[in-house]
Amino acid sequence: MLDFNKIEPEEGKLDLDLRCVNYDLDDKSHLRYGDWVTFKSHSSKKVRISRPESPRGENSDRQPQDADYPSLSYELESEILARFPRWEYWKLSLVNKRCSMLLKSGEIFEIRKENGFKEPSVYMLASGETNWWTFDREFKSRRKIPDLPSDVCFTFGDKESLCAGTHLLVSGREIDGLVIWRFELATNCWYKGPSMVNPRCLFASATCGTSVFVAGGVGIMANSEVYDTAEKYNPDSRSWDLLPRMKRKRKLCSGCYMDKKFYVIGGRNENGELTCGEFFDEGRNKWELIPDMLKDDPVLTCHSPPLIAVVNNELYSLEASSNQLKLYMKKTNTWKMLGQVPVRADSNRGWGIAFKSLGNELLVIGAASSSASYSGNSMAIYTCCPDPDVIELQWKPLDSGRNRLSSFILNCSVMVA
């Protein structure tokens, strides 16, 4: 009889020593070596439990050691480890060489993708820091990722960040020009490139699954014109592909992915501020203009790009001048006020604020409002499940200022893998 004393079902949790396995088995008591096990997942994989081979042909009843589980096939072991919380994956390199290679090759993330496992984490660069930090979803744990090996110009210059699958892309300027540095979660290392077809800054971006879209922006030359070009990044090939040109040239714009379309909103060009938006329909391979999408937004001098995020396929905006959260009404092309957020977006005209989607919640990070419990200059972190029908939204504070990082956020991206 197969011993499952160390394999107990527990939803959503798997300890590294394999004492907890997220099986969906109806009856473990009748399983024997040679039986097939079906995982109730998107891929409904079926694997065989094999009996370990005893040394010198002996029929040993010894228990497997801490990091040695010969009774599990490689396929079954991989399926189990894929259910392990992604935040703890760094421990795999301490188990054995095969587990380490499962992580570094990226195979474990492919298994997670096939089975529909998704877990968000937040990557952030705060003012006064030269290192990026990554946080788990609840901001209960954080880790400093390796130093980005660029030059001083890139380190202290303006940067833009975006996530595509398990890649964190950071765009900025080195002494020789615009570059992109790529952090790969699997290897925990930085790599240079690939550069965009049209290198740019001050652009809009949005993530869709494992791909990322960029549009608009401007080059770094003094006489560079504002772009109407767009591109799509494929993390599998580590390459950029050109998309059709937008209807309007724009820089300092914002992007999001909603209704299976890439939206680009606001910004400015040679003629001034833009209140229109537009979206790219990948199925039709064309852009459509949305006039007056931001017509009621007050125009501030030197303001940030629009602060927008999509949760449950609904578009939300944080108005920098009033700290008001707004919901976009698709049918009427108008915005509905939902109340104030607990951070000060108005203190720096929207700059230094992180406003992101985090699963089915909104995430906002910045300087706390006067009514908040945070003190000093440490960042305030809040999440909220937005509901257009409630009178007052309930914002949940996270971290309680323990991290002591600056409240001015230079870059922030959410990785879902």
Residue ranges and their predicted role:
Residues M1-S71:
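CRL adaptor-proximal regions
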Residues D3, H30, R51, E58-R142:
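Skp1-binding F-box subdomain of Cullin-RING ligase substrate receptors
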Residues P70-S71, E110-S127, S150-S171, I180, ...:
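Conserved short beta-strand element of beta-propeller blades
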Residues T134-R137, V179-T187, Y227-S237, T275-R284, ...:
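Beta-propeller blade signature
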Residues R143, Y191-G193, D241-L243, E288-I290, ...:
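A structural motif specific to WD40 beta-propellers
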Residues L307, T334-W335:
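Plant regulatory low-complexity segments
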Residues W335-P342, D389-R402:
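WD40-like beta-propeller blades
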Residues D346, V364-I365, S371-M379, V390-L393:
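Short active-site-adjacent structural elements
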